């Protein structure tokens, strides 16, 4: 409008003036006006405020493409951390390199380019300037915009506080949040009917309601503490050792600004390197694994409701100005385990976190687990080394019944593992790896080589070998098998941006299992996974994507009382188109699946779905989802992301014939209070019951309602970051 006003004044002046201008002068004025118009438009384009996509679009674009029947592990704590960061975005002009490196979709070159640009320009004027950062492609910009904001001045050395606060201030001057969610099923499962002859396994002790309460406190990145209580559906309340709920989890984190130490008390997570000792430092996504970023050992609070994968105790980190860092922790937990009849030996671990039947309650916290670890690292800009050791002692011997596939599984009371990880950064290359050895000398190793020949292209290769007898109880690397052992493989990945707003990415993963597995009774079975995705964005409001996935794996086949192996192959194709405006967004998606076996079995499945969101006002928003699916059987099942309440995540598998719908309403009657309601309905056309055994529903309908209340106390002046 301002430019239009200026141009109009110039034209009126020229028309009213008696001065005669030459044709050459008129051309110059015309060129000036055109260039001014282009410049103003560029400035307004750069000053685009707000994220380029919503949280739901990020989950559907980045996470859900990697979730299928393969069962890749999605770290719930990291997913929840990303969701909370999306709700409280980092200030891009004050965030540090460590903050940006925590995002799994960014590589170090992109982070360095962003920081260099910020230093030269004395800060970002808006998120639109991300398009001027070298190496920052369209989708990286969109993903990052979900978690950062631009509403503060640039500070050269990071955040500086003019007020000296005591530790007590860190623990009291921040923001408080209380959240409660109640899930109500509008149906009845078989397990809630007490049979005439009750036993320890044929009915649920509690009611069908699921309830979770969360309390969270945070003071920027410097302090945090929280408490989580959860009751799963079917679990009792205030009886049989539940006070009042089954699951309690709390944590305290203190990491004062400009201090070189941090401390964690209570429940915490450990992530390190490539995951041969502890969980991998990021999501276990093969497409993202090609980014080639080394993430050293880190502690983080356990904030999710996952009742199995965490430590409980004390963790401490201390770093020096010369790049040295020391980490140490000690943990003690009571695990769910199935014991022998005399109770002196554990036979298996129960990791579902469910305690609904008497037999599940009997297994609750029956095995003590003491874990300690120490590590030292030297991290420089061009290279780094890290040495970590972990010791675990069970209170009772662990010995699972012998089967053909578990002869090399852990047995005993004590396990000890040590790992050495490294990274090297030659020009245009990124090399990292990890070697781990257990107390018996069995080795596992994983190495990654990435090469970037321009900001538009990146290729990577990863090689792994896990000894069949290697034991690491907390390892979680990227693999096709269910544990970090008995596997060798190679992964090749590619990421290419041929033209602006177009991205092609994919990988090929080959694996061989040295010893028999649960699914393949013959040694040296093989598996191949392939993935190819193309994404195109014509503008900031419309995107088109296509993804193809191939999964081929050998399984046991019994022919004439003789065991052999057969390949079972699954092809999946997904096409999606998304529209996004300031107050609404919509995604139309089509999925297809073809499942075949070597003996001639063939199954087909397809699904069409629509997901949308609408911000009616600043206080009311509506999200919806509807899908129609037809599959021949469960092996041709398909997946789709549905709108979820905050801090909840699940991937719905669609099989057989039916329709599914979800409606989610969020209302803020006052600034600090948010009320949310989620209703879902699933209808099968070719079934008169759903699920089996104690979870059986004697109906073709499955309807659920969830209510969530969230109250947030705003941060005080000195609690902002």
Each language-model region and where it sits:
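Exposed, low-structure sequence patches enriched in small/polar residues
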Residues: 28-29, 201-208, 247, 309-317, ...
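Aromatic- and glycine-enriched pocket-lining scaffold segments that form the walls
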Residues: 308-356, 365-367, 371-375
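Bacterial Sec-dependent N-terminal signal peptides
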Residues: 1-49, 718-721
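Surface-exposed loop/turn segments flanking beta-strands in extracellular/periplasmic regions
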Residues: 284-295, 340-358, 408, 643-648
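Short helix/loop capping segments that flank catalytic or ligand/cofactor-binding pockets
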Residues: 190, 273-275, 327, 336-339, ...
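Compositionally biased linear targeting/interaction segments
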Residues: 27, 45-237, 243-254, 258, ...
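Residue-level recognition of beta-strand termini and adjacent short loop/turns
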Residues: 96, 107-110, 137-140, 220, ...
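Outer membrane beta-barrel
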Residues: 240-299, 303-336, 456-472, 619-634
